[in-house]
């Protein structure tokens, strides 16, 4: 199972949000590149980067920082936030991002999604962010009327191979992920599922591994040191 440390970018800094609320941010590192290098040194194989400003604006807003991270580390990087066009996808790939995460565009622009899947296949990951079972978009500011299960089924039909599922109410809370929703998702689709939001302990990670999750994204727990990245990597590797 892949372990992905999270770096959320806002105004060029590394921050954490609470339940997706932009007015509840905590700056965890003024220097995202340095943070990326710390995660690499601790043994991470892949980084998960979200351009929070971009998610709201609908276009990349921290591109230079993402490029600097890609240049500074040798491990792979997946990134998203505000990716709504083919040129935006190609820009991220050109600066060294290995996998591009789509969110809002996957729900609202199906022809675009189909085109990028045709062109880039498994390099495209779709992030499904849900609140009370329904999908949220535009940096979690807008709620839709489609359930996370229905969107996952649609993504599978289009040819998406990997999704990131986040229960927004759990994000940044250290209360554990939504195991029930993740289990239901796994029963309904054959996609590779990366779990995100609320992961707080080694026990959470072990339970996700027992559920055969493809990966897990860890953010706040690493910054607040309630989890040790090296220990998590060691335990998941030995299982």
UniProtKB/Swiss-Prot annotation:
<dbReference type="InterPro" id="IPR044524">
    <property type="entry name" value="Isoase_HisA-like"/>
</dbReference>
<keyword id="KW-0963">Cytoplasm</keyword>
<dbReference type="InterPro" id="IPR011060">
    <property type="entry name" value="RibuloseP-bd_barrel"/>
</dbReference>
<dbReference type="InterPro" id="IPR023016">
    <property type="entry name" value="Isoase_HisA-like_bact"/>
</dbReference>
<feature type="active site" description="Proton donor">
    <location>
        <position position="129"/>
    </location>
</feature>
<dbReference type="GO" id="GO:0000162">
    <property type="term" value="P:L-tryptophan biosynthetic process"/>
</dbReference>
<keyword id="KW-0413">Isomerase</keyword>
<keyword id="KW-0028">Amino-acid biosynthesis</keyword>
<dbReference type="GO" id="GO:0005737">
    <property type="term" value="C:cytoplasm"/>
</dbReference>
<dbReference type="Pfam" id="PF00977">
    <property type="entry name" value="His_biosynth"/>
</dbReference>
<keyword id="KW-0368">Histidine biosynthesis</keyword>
<feature type="active site" description="Proton acceptor">
    <location>
        <position position="8"/>
    </location>
</feature>
<dbReference type="InterPro" id="IPR013785">
    <property type="entry name" value="Aldolase_TIM"/>
</dbReference>
<comment type="pathway">
    <text>Amino-acid biosynthesis; L-histidine biosynthesis; L-histidine from 5-phospho-alpha-D-ribose 1-diphosphate: step 4/9.</text>
</comment>
<dbReference type="InterPro" id="IPR006062">
    <property type="entry name" value="His_biosynth"/>
</dbReference>
<protein>
    <recommendedName>
        <fullName>1-(5-phosphoribosyl)-5-[(5-phosphoribosylamino)methylideneamino] imidazole-4-carboxamide isomerase</fullName>
        <ecNumber>5.3.1.16</ecNumber>
    </recommendedName>
</protein>
<comment type="similarity">
    <text>Belongs to the HisA/HisF family.</text>
</comment>
<dbReference type="InterPro" id="IPR006063">
    <property type="entry name" value="HisA_bact_arch"/>
</dbReference>
<dbReference type="GO" id="GO:0000105">
    <property type="term" value="P:L-histidine biosynthetic process"/>
</dbReference>
<dbReference type="GO" id="GO:0003949">
    <property type="term" value="F:1-(5-phosphoribosyl)-5-[(5-phosphoribosylamino)methylideneamino]imidazole-4-carboxamide isomerase activity"/>
</dbReference>
């Amino acid at each position: 199972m892949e372990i992905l440390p999270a770096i959320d970018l806002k105004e060029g800094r590394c921050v954490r949000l609470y339940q997706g609320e932009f007015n509840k941010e905590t700056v965890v590192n003024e220097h995202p590149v340095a943070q990326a290098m710390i995660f690499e040194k601790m043994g991470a194989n892949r980084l998960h980067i979200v351009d929070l400003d971009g998610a709201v604006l609908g276009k990349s807003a921290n591109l230079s920082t993402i490029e600097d991270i890609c240049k500074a580390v040798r491990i792979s990087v997946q990134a998203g936030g505000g990716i709504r066009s083919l040129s935006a996808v190609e820009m991220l790939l050109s600066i060294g991002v290995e996998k591009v995460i789509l969110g809002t565009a996957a729900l609202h622009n199906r022809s675009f999604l189909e085109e990028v899947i045709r062109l880039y296949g498994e390099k495209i990951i779709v992030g499904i962010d849900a609140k009370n079972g329904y999908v949220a978009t535009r940096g979690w500011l807008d709620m839709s009327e489609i359930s996370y299960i229905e969107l996952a089924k649609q993504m599978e039909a289009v040819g998406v191979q990997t999704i990131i599922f986040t229960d927004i109410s759990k994000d940044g809370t250290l209360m554990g992920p939504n195991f029930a929703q993740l289990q239901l998702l796994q029963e309904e689709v054959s996609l590779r599922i990366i779990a995100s939001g609320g992961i707080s302990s080694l026990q959470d990670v072990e339970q996700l591994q027992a559920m055969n999750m493809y990966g897990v994204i860890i953010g706040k727990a690493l910054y607040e040191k309630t989890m040790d990245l090296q220990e998590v990597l060691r335990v998941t590797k030995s299982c």
